[in-house]
Amino acid sequence: MELHKRKNIRLKEYNYTQNGWYFVTICTNNRRPYFGEIINNVVVLNEYGNKIEKIIKDYNDVSTDVINDFYQIMPNHIHIIIRLVTTGKHNIGSIVSGLKSKCTKELKIKDLWQKNYYERVVRDQKEYDSIVKYIVENPFGDKYYW
């Protein structure tokens, strides 16, 4: 019996410890709306969502090499722009893994997250601005592609 092998969705040959901005989306397992709800196009966080927000904000107080530049907590996923200030010191994969682990421990929900995460290397200011617009408009359900 052959087991399903997950496809690697990362860029080949890319150094994910390189300084710069990374747009990351982390989804809850089975897209369960653990963090709140959308009411009149506004995300209303519940207790879990507020705990997630505190964890994200606290991360900026812990490290000056990794900055959570911009984020939006949705009912069943998180959008976050992570900025690595120093090349070689941190890896996006380990940062996301640490964030997922801390949230899981704090919320005490087994299988809180999907196994993987989505990321996009932000290449320039125009793309950064488009991603911020997408994140801000996400509660409205609009499709926006950069």
Predicted regions and their residues:
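Short catalytic/metal-binding and nucleic-acid-binding patches
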Residues: 1-146
